[in-house]
A protein has these predicted regions:
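Cytochrome P450 catalytic-core helices
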Residues: 107-132, 243-259
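Conserved cytochrome P450 K-helix E-x-x-R motif and the immediately C-terminal K′/meander segment
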Residues: 53, 57, 140-181, 202
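Cytochrome P450 proximal C-terminal region
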Residues: 13-16, 134-142, 148, 238, ...
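Conserved cytochrome P450 K-helix/beta-meander segment immediately N-terminal to the heme-binding cysteine loop
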Residues: 193-221
Length: 291
């Protein structure tokens, strides 16, 4: 197999370089600047080549083995076009896998960083989390079968993404003319919708800046309208990786919190850095203490 784990540091660095490129997209000069042979553009080109090399290697090895591993790549390799009957090309598979790398790396890392920070600032919630993990897991590592049983762990992750949604704003094109209050949005307009703003709306979330995982009990969830919470977007363009992200996040939180307490090392609150994702400015430096 393509040894992705041994290349994790290099792949992570390549992803970071490519994500930096997206931060310049709001500039009116983007179309011009992207074509110049600047050091930044050369770094992005090298990073893209590095990711392509790894991804095409994975695809080639999977095609050669013809093994169904029950994962997303196996599903895509077996997918057939309903009309033509053909499968996905290597380039199509590459595009899908690149999306998973880019969308799944930065967003999940940010969600987990904010979660550790919030738990370090809310010892009562952290204690409840530890209690659930001790009860459900004992000394064994969590598995996929445990995801549904780790209800409080899921509430912790849900509330973390309410407080600090990794994707804090998204754009949608209006398919028709629509009136909002005194304003008319013409058909074809690009409308920016902010998860961060909606997730801090006091109408739906009293004390919106308070970290409270119990907002997400079944009863409390039922009291709020559907799109008062949408960290993964919604509708036909809902994030394709949502279910994977939930399972991945819950299992990582459970695995680490089962054995460690996280202490926030820096002085003062974390500053927000709203780029293409909502990052903690300068990162979040944590101290691990064995439970």
């Amino acid at each position: 197999d393509a040894d992705v784990e041994s290349q994790a540091v290099e792949i992570g660095q390549a992803l970071t370089e490519i994500l930096k490129m997206f931060e310049t997209f709001s500039s009116p000069l983007t179309d011009i600047l992207d074509k110049l042979p600047t050091p930044a553009n050369r770094r992005v080109a090298r990073a893209r080549e590095r990711l392509d090399e790894t991804i095409y290697q994975i695809i080639d090895e999977r095609r050669s083995s013809s093994e169904d591993r029950g994962d997303l790549l196996s599903m895509m390799l077996m997918a057939q076009d309903e009309e033509g009957g053909g499968g996905m090309s290597d380039d199509q598979l590459r595009d899908e896998l690149m999306t998973l790398f880019l969308a799944g790396h930065e967003t999940t890392a940010n969600a987990l960083a904010w979660t550790w920070y919030l738990l370090s600032q809310n010892p009562e919630a952290e204690a409840k989390l530890h209690q659930e993990l001790d009860t459900v897991l004992g000394d064994r590592l969590p598995t996929m079968d445990d995801v549904r049983r780790l209800e409080y762990t899921e509430r912790v992750m849900t509330e973390s993404m309410r407080c600090y949604p990794p994707v804090w704003v998204m754009g949608r094109r209006s398919i028709g003319s629509y009136k909002v209050g005194e304003y008319t949005i013409p058909a074809g307009s690009i409308v920016l919708v902010s998860q961060y703003v909606m997730h801090h709306n006091e109408e739906y979330y009293p004390e919106p800046f308070k970290f409270d995982p119990d907002r997400w009990t079944a009863e409390n969830r039922a009291s709020r309208p559907k799109y008062s919470y949408f960290p993964f977007g919604g509708g036909p363009r809902l994030c394709i990786g949502e279910q994977f992200a939930w399972a991945e996040g819950i299992l990582i939180i459970a695995t680490l919190a089962q054995r460690w307490k996280m202490g926030y090392e820096s002085k003062g609150p974390v500053e927000l850095q709203p780029l293409i994702t909502l990052r903690p400015k300068g990162g979040v430096k944590m101290k691990l203490e064995r439970r």
